[in-house]
């Protein structure tokens, strides 16, 4: 679904991109989009089409080609929220679009300019790309679990692994964290890891800023950005008691956690 943005935020007017954002009133988050706009729409359309297959072939969080949130974990959290909560209504979908190389609009010179893509024009993977990769790697067998009010959760079985994906979409980006306690009946695991997408992990925008915001990164800079912003697995402490795995983590606004339990 498409939306305009709320709040003008802090905008740099010294460049074409900054002037465009100021002229368009581009802020940091959608202002006309509810968390469940896509899900509610898909459910209504599914009732209309009945047994016919339903595909959403072009969707995204924001219609502004320059919105800062398109380059952040907010986009990733939105994509996961839509996918995890629309699976019963739609048969397939395609996020619009894969790359910031967008033929319908001129290209801004900045590598990170709020483009629609899952990757920048030089191929740097954004947080949304990694979030969808988490889903792709999780396997095809999903467990039925209750939906929470603020945190989206999904559990998948893949051979000798269990993948748990957590996401917390919050357009207002409020402070505060949710504590997640997990109890899972299972054989004793050999290892439990967590991968994070947030301000400090899998955030290529921050790494790009750290290397001087090059408009066209050279090969060395591209390699550094890719390496530093790739999600990493970290050991997650756990207990195994009475045939159950007990573990906990926390999550904040527009953050994502991928937990893998290996046996």
PLM regions: where:
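Noncatalytic carbohydrate-binding groove/subsite architecture in carbohydrate-active enzymes
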Residues: 1-85, 89, 111
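Short, solvent-exposed beta-strand-terminating loops
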Residues: 1-10, 92-102, 197-211
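A structural motif corresponding to the C-terminal end of an alpha-helix
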Residues: 41-54, 85-92, 135-141, 238-247
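Aromatic/acidic polysaccharide-binding cleft in carbohydrate-active enzymes
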Residues: 58-175
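Extracellular/periplasmic loop regions
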Residues: 104-109, 205-212, 217-222
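Residues that act as N-cap/strand-start positions at coil-to-secondary-structure junctions
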Residues: 147-150, 176-178, 232, 241-243
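Carbohydrate-binding surface patches
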Residues: 150-212, 250-258
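C-terminal beta-strand-rich structural cap/linker in extracellular carbohydrate-active enzymes
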Residues: 215-263
């Amino acid at each position: 679904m498409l939306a305009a943005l709320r709040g003008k935020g802090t905008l740099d007017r010294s460049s074409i991109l900054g002037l465009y954002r100021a002229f368009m009133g581009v802020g940091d988050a959608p202002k006309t989009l509810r968390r469940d706009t896509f899900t509610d729409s898909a459910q209504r359309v599914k009732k209309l089409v009945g047994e016919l297959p339903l595909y959403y072939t072009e969707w995204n969080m924001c219609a502004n080609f320059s919105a800062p949130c398109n380059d952040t974990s907010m986009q990733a959290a939105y994509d996961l929220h839509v996918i995890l909560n629309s699976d019963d209504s739609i048969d397939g979908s395609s996020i619009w679009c894969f790359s910031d190389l967008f033929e319908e609009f001129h290209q801004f010179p900045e590598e990170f300019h709020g483009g629609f893509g899952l990757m920048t024009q030089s191929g740097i993977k954004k947080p949304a790309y990694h979030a969808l990769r988490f889903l792709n790697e999780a396997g095809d067998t999903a467990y039925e679990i209750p939906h929470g009010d603020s945190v989206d959760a999904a559990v998948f079985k893949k051979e000798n692994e269990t993948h748990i994906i957590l996401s917390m979409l919050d357009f207002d980006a409020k402070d505060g964290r949710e504590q997640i306690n997990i109890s899972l009946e299972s054989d004793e695991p050999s290892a439990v890891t967590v991968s994070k997408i947030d301000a400090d992990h899998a955030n290529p925008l921050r790494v790009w800023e750290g290397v001087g915001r090059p408009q066209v990164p050279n090969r060395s800079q591209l390699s550094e950005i890719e390496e530093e912003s790739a999600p990493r697995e970290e050991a997650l402490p756990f207990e195994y008691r009475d045939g159950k795995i007990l573990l906990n983590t926390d999550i904040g606004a527009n953050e994502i956690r991928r937990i893998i339990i290996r046996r």
